[in-house]
Amino acid sequence: MAIANANYEFIMIDVGTNDRVSDGGVLKNTKFWNMFENNQLQIPEPQELPNFNKKMPFVFVGDEAFQLLPNFMKPYNKQVLNDNRRIFNYRLSRARRIIENVFGILASRFKILQKPIKLSPTKAKIVVMACCHLHNLLMKQKNYIRNGE
């Protein structure tokens, strides 16, 4: 489970849950969820968007597996879509692509993540966390160029 910002950097990583658990189930077993439930995340106060006179809250964007909660957005059920909801789902999906793209960049940088890691769960967790931290470091290096580019 991970959360990324608009700069394609991880801001929260939780590694080690069995892949058979749903995203919603994984979330409830994270330190992030515990902090969220106990109001310890220090989510900024709502702010005005550019050219928009109304204050909007900061939110986390999830998929259908997540619960709809304050500061959490998820798509409308596909069974009850009208045009406005379809547009909303499309735009929410564009926001969700950030984390999907971050995982794509991560996997393309670190080939070890493209197949099952043949290490103990403890060591595999360390490898994944190290890859995520190195990814963030590389994202901050604006002049980083991969070999062959």
Which stretches of residues belong to each language-model region?
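Short, well-ordered secondary-structure "scaffold" segments embedded in the functional core
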Residues: 1-149
